[in-house]
Amino acid sequence: MAEKTKAFELRTKNKTQLLEHLKELRTELSSLRVAQVKSPNPSKLAKIGTVRKAIARVLTVFNQTQKNHLRAVYSKKSSSKIPTDLRYKKTRAIRRRLTNKQSKVVTLRVSKTATNFPQRVFAVKA
């Protein structure tokens, strides 16, 4: 079971299959740890690393698929209703920045001045 599992192969599996595979890998890891204590065989030690990485790979695929499904569920809702871990990341400064609509808002006085005194266009004599 310790052969290297590929992430693209794991993505084809459904949730129950992934959890079964994870359970198998964890039991194998525990048996390898017991074998490590009983007899320090170098081949078993190397196998522990591959099994641990396989477990990490399965968990990564599982969490990514789960997050994608949740994003699809929340896609129709407004941004304030989406859980924070599903929102876009960007940077803190960008998230706090004014939106385009907010930055284009002009006071009444400025808008009246702009309409009453438009910018002049000059023709250049050649």
UniProtKB/Swiss-Prot annotation:
What are the alphabetically sorted keywords of the record?
Ribonucleoprotein, Ribosomal protein
Q: Which CDD domains match?
A: Ribosomal_L29_HIP
SUPFAM superfamilies recorded: Ribosomal protein L29 (L29p) (SSF46561)
**One GO-annotated biological process of the protein:** maturation of LSU-rRNA from tricistronic rRNA transcript (SSU-rRNA, 5.8S rRNA, LSU-rRNA)
Tell me the GO molecular function terms. mRNA binding; structural constituent of ribosome
**GO cellular component terms, A-Z:** cytosolic large ribosomal subunit
Family matches, as InterPro entries: Ribosomal_uL29, Ribosomal_uL29_CS, Ribosomal_uL29_euk, Ribosomal_uL29_sf
The record, for Pfam families, names: Ribosomal_L29
Residue spans making up a coiled coil are none
What does the similarity note say? Belongs to the universal ribosomal protein uL29 family.
Name the UniProt record assigns to this protein: Large ribosomal subunit protein uL29
Name the source organism.
Dictyostelium discoideum
